[in-house]
């Protein structure tokens, strides 16, 4: 009798150890990123609640798109999972499930959970099998970054998308494929009699329907592999019907309808951007800046730019000699081409222009494509440049300034008198009076050339 009593006390102690109040409250493990915990199988076959908590960390901008993943590696689905902010909350959920009146059609069983990096979260696992718990940290979650970028892109492109016919048909086809199941349920509801008792049946049917939808979502990959042909036929038929309905209705033409579509798209983009990060305060701040930049009047933006440029003007860069010569050649060719195009157009009064010119034949040849300078002028220009480059060092070495000549007698840069005068200076002075008359004639020609230039 004494040994039998000890055996009963031992068995009672083992069963008492499985009560949540005795084990779950003390069996708590705090995890850090990179933690790996391997738990062995319960040899007594009892389900033991173990709670795993992530304490969270401080909010930082660098962790805007960071994600913490809780990975549960277990061989079967023979386990229960509970969530909460604290171990006490997890324990309370565990106790609530032990009640005879609890219905758990939507019990959470996921082997991969995404946790907020900035909040404390606890997960309770109740199982008799061996399993492994891993906590991973992803500093930059590319999926969340892509979700944020798509949300901002939809927000900025909502006005154009609301008027795009291709986008209208694509969205209509997608909605038709997803909503076809609801149409089937609606048609099936028409077959039931409209009585008070049937509402309870319909409510229960909707609950079972949601449960079926959840099971379909959990086993979507298996369904796509097993019933690939049926799924493809369903997508083709419902997509074609949806396209025909959208084609019959047509894209919205009313400006108010387009505005409503734009608002809906902007709301969808804002929701996508908001749920793309666990750092909600930073995301809200970014979205406020995006809204202000999107709806900010352009006139205000231009005024701010003008005031900023006036207060901090840009430093102008001077052209180099090579850039100046290149720009001169390009602009001269462009101006000559525009002039030739104008004189050949009906807008130009050719006879009136030719009546004012001293050399109409040269003007006519220029209009027909001839160059604007002849060979002699080009040679004079090249010779003048060479002489000016040779004379520059000599002028710098001479300290005494040259005697000033009268302004009305200064030779033109490309004039023929300049070269004749230079040739005469190199020859000995003649004693006859005929040279004086030639000099006066050259001066008269020079004055005539100046008047023509002016």
UniProtKB/Swiss-Prot annotation:
One Gene Ontology CC term in the entry: nuclear envelope
Tissue specificity as recorded in UniProt: Expressed in both germline and somatic cells in the larval testis and prepupal ovary (at protein level). Also detected in the larval eye and larval wing disk (at protein level).
Biased composition range(s): Acidic residues: 388-405, 428-446
Phenotype on disruption: ~40% pupal lethality. Male and female sterility with males showing extremely small testes and females showing extremely small ovaries. Somatic and germline cells initiate differentiation but subsequent development is disrupted. Adult testes contain spermatocytes but rarely contain elongated haploid spermatids. In ovaries, most of the germline cells degenerate at the prepupal stage and the remaining germline cells do not complete oogenesis. Defects in nuclear shape due to a markedly distorted nuclear envelope which is highly convoluted with regions of blebbing and deep invaginations.
GO aspect biological process, one term: nuclear membrane organization
Spans traversing the lipid bilayer: 138-158, 166-186, 197-217, 231-251, 280-300
Cell location: Nucleus inner membrane
Disordered, as annotated region: 388-454
Principal subcellular localisation of the protein: nucleus
Positions glycosylated per UniProt: 38
Signal peptide location: 1-18
InterPro entries reported in the protein's UniProt record: NEMP_fam
Comp. bias (Polar residues): 414-424
Keywords attached to this entry: Glycoprotein, Membrane, Nucleus, Signal, Transmembrane, Transmembrane helix
Tree of life domain: Eukaryota
Protein topology in the membrane: Multi-pass membrane protein
PANTHER family in UniProt: AT07567P-RELATED
Function: Contributes to nuclear envelope stiffness in germ cells. Required for male and female fertility.
Complexes and interactors: Interacts with OTE.
Recorded family membership: Belongs to the NEMP family.
Name of this protein: Nuclear envelope integral membrane protein
High-level lineage: Eukaryota, Metazoa, Ecdysozoa, Arthropoda, Hexapoda
